[in-house]
């Protein structure tokens, strides 16, 4: 959910700490590669640990929901390293406290619901099937950016939406796909619906978050993005805790921990690892925005959607059906269209800067 507009890139560079400005080229590349590793690996690991939790006897959907945002205090570390921006303070004076609270509460509630749907989807689906379906978020991105953020839908974006939609439909109709929990076809369809609907909500909240920065807060800096991530995650975590107690799942946690096949220590480490990996992915995304650009960060995040289903097949030996073998290349083609369109947009921005500099 970390989206920063390219035309603001130069202005944000002025807030880069002097420590980064003193980096030589090799040090800069090391930090970039570390950030890429954090982003791709963390997103894949969080999905794999979530599937591992269910495979080994975990059954709490609300605990799985909580770990997706519960590690948000980690984000205070990178936030403390950033300088206080003038735009952040000016936006606070121009935007009422009630407006900020409303934004954090509404987006945080949406994130909490979104994470719950992701948890239900992962419960009923194999990790590879789940990851392929979650790639549909790119298709929804194009639609919401057009209607909410007034961004054009080019031919490449149209074909990206088309290919990703076809891939999602094929996977959802795959009769040979195995449900990891051995549930019925009905449960499999529920998992597919939850994964796709969660991707829709995720894309919607990205567009609404960018809309909030542009139209309400009137500014967008790295500090503000991290603050938005922290406070919305806090609200989403509260939603998960309320759901945990309201559903009565909290009473079964001690039994679940005792019956976890790999033992209580692994149970705790699995949940902690999932929570930490979710936040490390966020740190990696912010770092790439900081070191390179928002476009590059979004592209690497897109590439992680390709890595995750492949990692799931390798780790959990998910059933690679004929339909899935067709759906994955179609989804990858949709990724390619999406990435190439972003490359063209970035090229256009670079040329405009060069022309303005001359």
Curated annotation (Swiss-Prot):
Transmembrane segments: 29-49, 62-82, 100-120, 128-148, 153-173, 189-209, 235-255, 280-299, 300-316, 320-340
Assigned keywords, A-Z: Membrane, Transmembrane, Transmembrane helix, Transport
Membrane topology: Multi-pass membrane protein
Annotated compartments: Membrane
Top-level taxon of origin: Eukaryota
InterPro entries for the chain: PUP_plant
GO biological process per UniProt: purine nucleobase transport
Broad class of the protein's primary localization: membrane
One GO MF term attached to the UniProt entry: purine nucleobase transmembrane transporter activity
Pfam families for this protein: PUNUT
GO CC list: membrane
Similarity comment: family membership: Belongs to the purine permeases (TC 2.A.7.14) family.
Stated name of the protein: Putative purine permease 12
Organism: Arabidopsis thaliana (Mouse-ear cress)
């Amino acid at each position: 959910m970390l989206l920063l507009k390219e035309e603001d890139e130069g202005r944000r560079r002025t807030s880069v700490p002097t420590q980064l400005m003193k980096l030589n080229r090799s040090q800069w590349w090391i930090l970039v590669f570390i950030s890429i590793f954090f982003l791709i690996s963390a997103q894949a690991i969080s999905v794999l640990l979530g599937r591992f939790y269910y495979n080994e006897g975990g059954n709490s959907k609300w605990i799985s929901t909580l770990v997706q945002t519960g590690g948000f205090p980690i984000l205070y570390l990178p936030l403390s390293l950033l300088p206080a921006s003038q735009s952040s303070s000016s936006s606070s004076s121009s935007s009422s406290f009630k407006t900020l609270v409303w934004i954090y509460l509404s987006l945080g509630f949406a994130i909490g619901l979104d994470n719950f749907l992701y948890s239900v989807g992962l419960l009923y689906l194999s990790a590879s099937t789940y990851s392929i379906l979650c790639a549909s978020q790119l298709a929804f991105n194009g639609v919401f950016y057009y209607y909410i953020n007034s961004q054009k839908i080019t031919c490449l974006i149209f074909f990206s939406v088309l290919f990703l939609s076809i891939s999602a439909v094929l996977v959802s109709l795959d009769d040979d796909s195995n449900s990891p929990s051995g549930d019925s076809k009905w449960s499999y369809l529920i998992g597919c619906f939850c994964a796709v609907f969660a991707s829709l909500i995720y894309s919607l909240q990205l567009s609404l978050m960018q809309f909030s920065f542009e139209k309400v807060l009137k500014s967008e800096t790295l500090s503000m993005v991290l603050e938005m991530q922290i406070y919305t995650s806090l609200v989403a975590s509260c939603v998960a805790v309320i759901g945990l107690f309201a559903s009565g799942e909290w009473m079964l946690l001690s039994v679940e921990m005792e019956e976890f096949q790999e033992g209580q220590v692994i149970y705790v480490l699995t949940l902690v690892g999932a929570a930490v990996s979710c936040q490390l992915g966020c740190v990696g995304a912010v770092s790439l925005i900081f070191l390179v650009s928002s476009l590059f960060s979004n592209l690497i995040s897109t590439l992680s959607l390709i890595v995750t289903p492949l990692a799931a097949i390798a780790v959990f030996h998910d059933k690679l059906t004929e339909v899935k073998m067709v759906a994955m290349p179609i989804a990858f083609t949709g990724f390619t269209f999406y990435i190439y369109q972003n490359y063209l947009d970035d090229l256009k921005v670079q040329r405009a800067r060069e022309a303005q500099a001359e």
